[in-house]
Amino acid sequence: MSRYQLCFEALAQKQQGAFVPFVTLGDPDAELSLKIIDALIEGGADALEIGIPFSDPLADGPTIQGANLRALNANVTPTLCFELLSQIRQKHPTIPIGLLVYANLVFSNGVDNFYHKCQQAGVDSVLIGDVPLREAKQFREAALSANIAPIFICPPNADDELLQELATSAEGYTYLLSRAGVTGTDKRAEQSLTHLTSKLKAYNAPPALQGFGISEPQQVSQAISNGAFGAISGSAVVQIIENNLHQPDVMLKMLTQFVQQMKAATISV
């Protein structure tokens, strides 16, 4: 069984959903980035979603673009990121680790080589933010041959055909998009996605984790009551980093507290 399957089964037995924070690796620098990961896990993160710094993150709003720039300015390269990922995996052997990257980064490493590096570093899944499912064949095959789960986005306007394709193509989890657009906390996740989650379950798709606009515990509860297995929060996490760059101890404490609050919202009363 994969780390995702083990994680989700254990949570289901405890009647809990999953809370997954996102950060850009190397933000604001490599050393502090590792402490940030520890703080997120200490707070109760069930899995991690990690970005590799990239100069043109198309799907990201200004908060996560800022994280990319800080990491790039700290000379964080993809090679260093794989070293950091190996360290994270060594310290935290059971937590699922997913990467959110862009196609240029994968191509520049060579597609097969990129997934091989992921496998060597202990990565569990890869989501390529700018490659829709229908263009993903090459990436999916390379992922599966390296024992990496290919993650795909389910948009809020997905039709039946796409939902069935997602169910048969995806592994690990399904990234359920709260809304169209770019990431950020100013555009809240308001739309009910029950019709999508019920169909994804009917088609036996991997568990849905809802992302985009998730910044408050009540949105995590809402995502789960709408049928998602859990929620992913990125911009709200990165905002805490950005707001506390000059007081890292406060930053780490606030990150742990934020995850604790969001995780608490996944627990059935």
Curated annotation (Swiss-Prot):
Enzyme class: lyase
Family annotation (SUPFAM superfamilies): Ribulose-phoshate binding barrel (SSF51366)
Reaction equation(s) it catalyzes: (1S,2R)-1-C-(indol-3-yl)glycerol 3-phosphate + L-serine = D-glyceraldehyde 3-phosphate + L-tryptophan + H2O
Residues at the catalytic site: E49 (proton acceptor), D60 (proton acceptor)
CDD domains: Tryptophan_synthase_alpha
Annotated EC: 4.2.1.20
Pfam families documented for this protein: Trp_syntA (PF00290)
UniProt entry keywords in alphabetical sequence: Amino-acid biosynthesis, Aromatic amino acid biosynthesis, Lyase, Tryptophan biosynthesis
Top-level taxon of the source organism: Bacteria
Family: Belongs to the TrpA family.
PANTHER family (UniProt xref): TRYPTOPHAN SYNTHASE ALPHA CHAIN, CHLOROPLASTIC, TRYPTOPHAN SYNTHASE, ALPHA CHAIN
Description of how the protein assembles with itself and partners: Tetramer of two alpha and two beta chains.
Protein's name according to its UniProt entry: Tryptophan synthase alpha chain
Record organism: Proteus mirabilis (strain HI4320)
Gene that this sequence comes from: trpA
